[in-house]
């Protein structure tokens, strides 16, 4: 049944809450009206799929349909991202296709799908690795100076930093910054000068700069004494009851 969610449990139910609370009329399933409606102070650290759910919600308000579309898109988005990165580093099309498909269907994605679907959506991880490669191989990449904005890769890095900062609920941005720190350490040890790690520091700063606005709603909620979904957990068990009720109703 297309209207019945493919998976249950884990953070995937968060997206059910997004559809039912933020982007359409609330459903009449068993969970309503006994759970708390999401407030104005939700952190926006996973905007990639917030935007996806909002867009799909323009055409259908059926929870199961949106949920299933979310599940089906993840492997293809991961594979497409992998293909793009492999092409950018100079691999042939057929090799890029093969490696991208392998990345999109990796067991990790399948295992995380039913538990933490936001982590299965790891389409910006290849771009994290690409940024590390650019820092290591391109001496002009993300180097502070007058010609900073004349380098096309620097503009691409800004776009990638936004995607990384808004993907994986802050997990993947932190991992990316860690990878960049390791890259910076290797470059400093290789060249024996601190300036060798400058591009990594600039890239980390770009990711952090994009992440800061994502947490503004949460901070405002805490300052107002109302908390947020991150601090009071309003989504977890209530929406879990609601999504399970779809199987019954």
Locations of the language-model features?
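Start-transfer (signal-anchor) and selected internal transmembrane alpha helices
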Residues: 1, 198-206
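Membrane-interface coil-to-helix junctions
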Residues: 1-78, 106-122, 241-249
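Generic recognition of well-ordered alpha-helical segments
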Residues: 18-22, 131, 184, 218, ...
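Short, aromatic- and cysteine-enriched interfacial helices/patches
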Residues: 33-34, 58-59, 143-149, 194
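Membrane-embedded helix bundles of polyisoprenyl
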Residues: 70-89, 93-188, 207, 213
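A cytosolic-side transmembrane-helix exit/cap motif
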Residues: 118-119, 143-144, 196-199, 223
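Membrane-interface helix-loop-helix junctions at transmembrane boundaries of multi-pass membrane enzymes
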Residues: 149, 190-201
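Periplasmic/ER-lumenal interhelical loops and adjacent helix-loop junctions
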Residues: 210-249
């Amino acid at each position: 049944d297309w209207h019945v969610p493919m998976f249950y449990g884990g953070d995937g139910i968060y997206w059910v809450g997004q559809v039912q609370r933020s982007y359409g009329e609330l459903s009449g399933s068993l969970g309503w009206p006994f759970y708390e409606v999401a407030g104005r102070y939700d952190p926006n650290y996973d905007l990639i799929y917030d935007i996806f759910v909002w867009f799909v919600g323009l055409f259908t308000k059926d929870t199961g349909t949106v949920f299933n579309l979310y599940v089906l898109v993840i492997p293809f988005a991961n594979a497409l991202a992998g293909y793009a990165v492999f092409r950018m580093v100079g691999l042939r099309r057929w090799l890029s296709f093969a490696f991208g498909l392998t990345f999109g269907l990796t067991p990790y994605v399948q295992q995380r799908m039913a538990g933490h679907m936001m982590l299965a959506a790891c389409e910006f991880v290849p771009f994290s690795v690409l940024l590390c490669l650019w820092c290591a191989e391109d001496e002009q990449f993300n180097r502070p100076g007058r010609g900073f904005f004349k380098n096309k890769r620097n503009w691409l890095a800004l776009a990638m930093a936004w995607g990384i900062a808004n993907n994986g609920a802050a997990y993947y941005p932190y991992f990316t910054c860690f990878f960049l720190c390791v890259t910076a350490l290797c470059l400093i040890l290789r060249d024996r000068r601190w300036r060798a790690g400058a591009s990594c520091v600039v890239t980390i700063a770009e990711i952090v700069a994009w992440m800061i606005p994502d947490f503004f709603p949460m901070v405002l909620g805490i300052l107002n004494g109302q908390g947020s979904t991150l601090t009071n957990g309003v989504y977890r068990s209530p929406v879990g009851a609601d999504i399970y009720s779809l199987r019954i109703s």
